[in-house]
Swiss-Prot record:
Function: The full peptide presents antibacterial and cytotoxic activities. The synthetic C-terminus (AA 33-76) inhibits voltage-gated potassium channels Kv1.1/KCNA1, Kv1.2/KCNA2, and Kv1.3/KCNA3.
Keywords (A to Z) from UniProt: Antibiotic, Antimicrobial, Disulfide bond, Ion channel impairing toxin, Neurotoxin, Potassium channel impairing toxin, Secreted, Signal, Toxin
MF annotations from Gene Ontology: potassium channel regulator activity; toxin activity
Protein family per UniProt: Belongs to the long chain scorpion toxin family. Class 2 subfamily.
The protein's name in its UniProt record: Potassium channel toxin TtrKIK
Compartment(s): Secreted
Source superkingdom: Eukaryota
Organism expressing this protein natively: Tityus trivittatus
Length: 91
């Protein structure tokens, strides 16, 4: 009789632990989902800020001028950045 009651108590505790674990796992997914959404939102803000910055030619050229210089140097020319277009001028 006592052994049966202990079994029931342990089974009840196990069931409560299982329910608690499943509940916490659901909350964990919810928290991870919120973190993922915030990271996506931050990425979109950074990307739109960069696009806005580079859409203005006076700011874009310094950002890509080094790429243009390197690209044209490989062709044995001088690179000149002009409104997002890399112009290679041969010497």
């Amino acid at each position: 009789m006592v052994a049966t009651n202990r079994c029931c108590v342990f089974a009840l505790l196990f069931a409560l632990l299982l329910v608690h674990s499943l509940t916490e796992a659901g909350k964990g997914k919810e928290v991870l989902g919120k973190i993922k959404d915030k990271l996506i939102e931050a990425k979109d803000k950074i990307k739109s800020g960069w696009e806005r910055l580079t859409s203005q030619s006076e700011y874009a050229c310094p950002a890509i001028e080094k790429f243009c210089e390197d690209h044209c140097a490989a062709k044995k020319a001088v690179g000149k950045c002009d409104d997002f277009k890399c112009n290679c001028i041969k010497l």
